[in-house]
A protein has these predicted regions:
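Short, basic-rich loop-to-helix N-cap that marks the start of a DNA-contacting helix
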Residues: 271-285
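Short amphipathic recognition helices of helix-turn-helix/homeodomain-type DNA-binding modules
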Residues: 293-342
Length: 343
């Protein structure tokens, strides 16, 4: 854990290992493969692959990364698309899993994948994306590994049209309306309404006669110690209480929240831990909180939902519609170019 989608050139990703979509003969291909060879150094990488020879379909082998910012290149032999009836899904999942196993074997903390088989291999992008997400998610739930899925465009995403349309409508109803407020339209209406209310009150006072207000009671300054005694639960205290109340294992929660074990340990050991907002929202999804419960959790960390934040409205939509799969939430956020939840 965690698993994140990024939009980047895979040859520039500073992970411990990057994955090359390879053929059985480990020869340089086109597209992503060619870009990796050129960035790593064609002669060195070609010689290294020739020394290995061949690799079976659905498996992966390792070479040095040479001039790339990564340490290793995992060459995953991907299937071409032949209609889906020739074991392509199992072979593609196997290629991902084999590369992930290499990451563990070479003690990598991070690995970056392109969307395997989706280019010149002809695999339908939505199906390729779903296999990538499912295979990677299953693996990182059991291993401490950060995995990046590097995507060039939104066309790879498996967001159903119905869900996307529903989110789009929700954002239009809330986020766009709030932006109207920021341009002054809503504020102007409220000012006019408030002015009318004050005029009506003034007229009432003139008719009834002004009544002097009672003297205000003197305010007693509260000591700093008193204020500290009345602090609410800290974020850490509230988070651990929510986990206990639900009878969940810590590991279940941080994995469902796209949080690494190391990150959770830091939170757990520090009562005054100050999380990032995306971390709080990730735990809200991982704990399957309601919107009201999420508001309380945010408050414990010094945050609140922002009406001017598209990310916040997307998360609120997911909470309202009980979408608690962190990868589905992050896919929607990625679709709208918003920061994803988790580490």
């Amino acid at each position: 854990m965690p698993f994140l989608m990024i939009r980047n050139d895979i040859t520039k990703v500073a992970a411990d290992a990057i994955v090359n979509p390879a053929n059985r003969n480990l020869l340089q291909g086109s597209g992503t493969s060619r870009a990796i060879y050129q960035a790593a150094g064609e002669q060195e990488l070609t010689a290294s692959c020739e020394a290995i020879g061949r690799c079976d379909l659905g498996r992966a082998v390792c070479t040095p990364a040479f001039a790339l910012p990564a340490k290793y290149i995992f060459h995953a032999v991907c299937p071409a698309w032949h209609g889906g009836g020739f074991g392509e899904a199992e072979q593609l999942a196997g290629a991902y899993h084999s590369a992930l196993e290499l990451a563990a074997e070479y003690h990598c903390e991070s690995v970056a994948f392109p969307l395997l088989s989706s280019g010149n291999y002809g695999y339908p992008k939505e199906q390729a994306f779903r296999i990538a997400v499912d295979t990677i998610t299953q693996y990182v739930m059991e291993h401490d590994l950060t995995v990046y899925l590097v995507l060039y465009d939104r066309g790879s995403l498996a967001v159903s049209r119905k869900l996307f349309a529903s989110v789009e409508e929700y954002i239009d109803d809330h986020y766009v309306a709030q932006n109207d407020e920021s341009y002054g339209f809503g504020r102007r209406r409220r000012e006019l309404s408030e002015r009318r209310r004050l005029l009506e009150e003034d007229a009432a006072v003139l008719m009834l006669g002004a009544v002097p207000a009672p003297a205000a009671a003197p305010r007693t300054a509260r000591s700093l110690e008193s204020l500290m005694d009345n602090l609410g639960e800290s974020f850490t205290t509230r988070l651990l209480r929510l986990i206990d109340e639900r009878g969940l294992k810590d590991s279940t929660v941080y994995k469902q929240s796209n949080i690494s074990r190391q990150h959770f340990s830091k939170i757990q050991c520090n009562r005054d831990y100050n999380p990032k907002k995306k971390t709080v929202l990730a735990f809200a999804v991982g704990l399957h909180l309601s919107e009201d419960e999420t508001i309380d959790l945010l408050k414990s960390a010094g945050y609140a939902f922002s009406d001017g934040s598209k990310r916040d409205w997307i998360v609120r939509y997911c909470l309202e519609h009980k979408i608690y799969n962190i990868n589905q939430v992050n896919t929607l956020l990625f679709e709208y170019d918003q920061e994803q939840l988790g580490a």
